[in-house]
Regions:
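Bacterial N-terminal signal peptides that target proteins for export
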Residues: 1-10
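Bacterial N-terminal signal peptides
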Residues: 9-19
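N-terminal helix-rich structural modules
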Residues: 27-232, 246, 661
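C-terminal, non-catalytic "cap/extension" segments appended to globular domains
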Residues: 29-51, 63, 222, 244-246, ...
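Short His/Asp/Glu-rich catalytic/ion-coordination signatures at enzyme active sites or charged loops
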Residues: 41-56, 105-124, 146-188, 248-289, ...
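Active-site-proximal, well-structured secondary-structure segments within enzyme catalytic domains
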Residues: 163, 195, 202, 207-248, ...
């Protein structure tokens, strides 16, 4: 279950009258109001980062926890017969202050984790877990919720009915129907998992930062562009300067920098640093003890809840429903993928042998390098040739925003008057086709040491008509920032990442739901990635592409020949990306389909990974998992346990949606409006398969288009 179910409906004056003394934080000059506990004067109620101090977060969380406890107690002590208003809605509204505070705080724990934020997280996490357990296992509260579900549910309509169902089932899935003994054990499991995930969240970024590869001379970086070399120098300086240059490891197994790095020994060092970052090769950085304990606890949790394993427990609330359906889906993809993967690997090795000799054996750290050379020879194209056309500012404004304008009628105006938590962050006011403001959107695109790897979307405030709250949404990425005065140029993969994350953002921006719990991206895990993956399709539509792909110095459009070669390169050797995702997906499921007794020791965790990949035919040193067990943050630190398959599952949905748009008008505002009305605005107010059918007319997703798009 999630915390933070509610929003204060009291006016500001009433709220201040009730505000306890701890809502005021000490400063050198005396007492000051904690800005996290007062109403923001900024547009949309945006967080005022010019006033918020790191020392404000913990006191605000403590006050908000106290308030939610009091609100829950009011529900429990209510002598009136339980009904939607005094129980379901009261519960929905019980923790809005806590949600407001933690939405802001947890935005920083991922994107700007300073030592102060890390220390606050360490103190706040057990407090929040304790509250979550208190609420999830509050017998009297659940009795009231169950009474409404049993006696009033069938009479309710629309979102009131859906909210009642979602809240009731979330309590059941948290263990509300368990015996007292099992309930107590579930509390212990939840608390321990929370502690372990906090340990993971501190250890993995430290391991990744430690895994940088120091480089003594510019000559060793031969093959890299001047911009990349400058970035290596900048990264070295920001990390203490042990050597003139350093190569920073990103969150995935393979490292994009290997594409151009000529020095084979250095390529090997970078790759080895990546795969061994957290497996205990350096004893200070070993996540396997955390992994195996979490796996044991999850297996026990699934068993306590009456399921064969944790995967089946986790998947019950998804479109897939159970692990067998996911296995069947993956087997179809593996069957189609395996021959193509073998053929691609042989082709790359044969190409490399033309220059390196017939005895040359392709290694995983060679693959990107020789694949890129092969692609250049066949298609006559390199990243360095196309990057000047992908200025990140143009991609955002003239690509991502322009597509949203064409399809959904949205307009974007930068708001430099709204403060942010870091100078790199930008704020935009989003308005509809009639000029009515509907959301704020923040973008934080550049990497820094305080930011975890990857790219994501979240919200400082979710949309809710009940609360009168418009959405405040943000995207975070990890692009390299150019030196001062120079444009930041990105690769095609990074272009699609911007479109992808903004697809998530649109799911939040265009939300039009009554209740916070149901709004925006609060949908099944194997549906939530569909809007983002679908939004990637706009990146290559000619009218959109030509609008943003302009040379950063001349402003000229990308020449037709170069554009054609670039678009062809997108489908060049596609087996790798599918294979690395399949391997990671199957690895995730393997860890969550085993019983407690089958979980290996930390020492044997690496061997378990290899054995499981071998058993399903995916132990391929040439195509390693996108994330290996020891640094698989989605699974051990995020919300994707037994759910990483959803990226492939939703790609099938996204291709079906894109095919519908292509057939009926890819940039037709009427089609965009229908997609907005039937899916993007609906949140979790309706079963997601029904939404999919309502829009496409298809009874179920069809994987044939996905396979074709992957060249299978």
């Amino acid at each position: 279950m999630k915390l933070n179910k509610a929003f204060l409906t009291l006016g500001l004056a009433a709220a201040l009258l009730q505000m306890p003394a701890s809502s005021f934080a000490q400063t050198a000059g005396g007492n000051r109001q904690n800005p996290l506990l007062t109403k923001s004067s900024l547009p949309f109620g945006a967080p005022d980062f010019s006033k918020i101090q790191e020392s404000d977060y913990l006191p605000a969380i403590e006050v908000a926890i106290k308030e939610q406890r009091a609100n829950i107690q009011k529900i429990v002590n209510n002598k009136k017969k339980p009904n939607f208003q005094n129980t379901i809605l009261a519960y929905e509204e019980s923790g809005a202050l806590l949600e407001k505070v933690t939405n802001i705080f947890f935005g920083l724990t991922s994107a700007h984790k300073t030592p102060g934020i890390a220390e606050t997280e360490k103190k706040a996490t057990p407090l929040l877990t304790e509250l979550d357990n208190e609420i999830s296992f509050n017998k009297k509260l659940f009795e009231r919720i169950k009474y409404v579900y049993d006696n009033e549910y069938k009479k309710l309509k629309g979102e009131d009915k859906r909210l009642t169902e979602v809240i009731y089932k979330s309590f059941v899935r948290s263990g509300a129907l368990l015996s007292a003994e099992k309930m107590e054990r579930m509390k212990q499991i939840n608390s321990r998992i929370s502690e372990l995930q906090q340990e993971w969240g501190n250890l993995l970024p430290a391991a990744t930062n430690n895994a940088v590869v120091w480089v003594n001379s510019k000559e060793e970086l031969a093959g890299l562009s001047d911009a990349d070399i400058a970035q290596c120098k900048k990264d070295a300086e920001s990390r203490g300067g042990k050597a003139p240059y350093c190569i920073v490891i990103i969150n995935t197994t393979q490292q994009p920098i290997l594409t151009n790095l000529q020095n084979r020994e250095l390529r090997k060092k970078v790759y080895m640093a990546s795969i061994h970052r957290a497996d205990g090769t350096n004893p200070k950085f070993n996540t396997f003890p955390i992994v195996t304990e979490i796996a044991k606890l999850r297996a026990e949790k699934g068993k306590l809840m009456g399921y064969a394993n944790y995967a089946d427990y986790s998947l019950e609330k998804t479109m897939a429903k159970n692990s067998k359906n996911v296995d069947d889906f993956l087997k179809q993809l593996i069957k189609e993928y395996a021959p193509k993967a073998d053929a691609e690997t042989k082709a790359i090795e044969a190409y490399a042998q033309k220059t390196e000799g017939k005895d040359f054996k392709l290694q995983p750290y060679d693959r990107f390098y020789y694949s890129a050379k092969m692609k250049k020879e066949i298609l006559n194209i390199t990243d360095d040739e196309i990057k000047p056309y992908f200025n990140i500012d143009s991609v955002q404004v003239n690509g991502v925003f322009y597509a949203a304008h064409r399809v959904y009628g949205l307009n974007f105006k930068q708001r430099k008057d709204i403060p942010t938590y870091h100078p790199d962050m930008k704020v935009f006011e989003v308005s509809d086709k009639n000029g009515k403001p509907i959301a704020l959107f923040y973008s934080d695109y550049f990497r820094r040491p305080t930011k975890r790897g990857g790219a994501w979307m979240s919200a400082f405030a979710k949309q809710s008509k009940q609360r009168g709250q418009l959405p405040i949404i943000y995207n975070v990425c990890n692009n390299a920032k150019a030196p001062e005065g120079q444009p930041s140029l990105i690769t095609w993969d990074e272009v699609t990442t911007l479109f992808h994350e903004f697809g998530h953002a649109l799911h939040g921006i265009l939300s039009d739901c009554k209740y916070n719990t149901l709004s925006g991206t609060a949908v099944a895990r194997d549906f939530v990635e569909m809007p983002s993956q679908f939004n990637e399709s706009f990146a290559s539509i000619p009218e959109i592409f030509d609008h943003y792909a302009r040379h950063t110095e001349t402003g000229a459009a990308m020449p037709a020949d170069l554009k054609e070669r670039m678009l062809k390169s997108i489908s060049f050797q596609t087996a790798y990306s599918l294979g690395e995702n399949l391997a990671a997906t199957c690895l995730d499921l393997a860890w969550h389909k085993i019983s407690e007794d089958e979980v290996p020791s930390p020492y044997m965790a690496g061997a378990f990974e290899k054995e499981e990949l071998h058993n399903i035919g995916l132990l391929n040193t040439q195509i390693p998992p996108r994330y290996s067990t020891s640094y698989f943050n989605h699974v051990w630190g995020g919300g994707y346990a037994a759910g990483y398959y959803s990226y492939l599952w939703t790609e099938v949905l996204a291709v079906n949606i894109a095919d519908y748009f292509a057939k009926h008008g890819a940039l037709d505002p009427a089609v965009g409006q229908a997609f907005r009305d039937k899916i993007l605005s609906r949140g979790n107010t309706k079963d997601q398969m029904e939404m999919f059918t309502d829009f496409t007319g298809m009874e179920k997703p069809d994987a044939s288009g996905f396979l074709k798009a992957r060249g299978l």
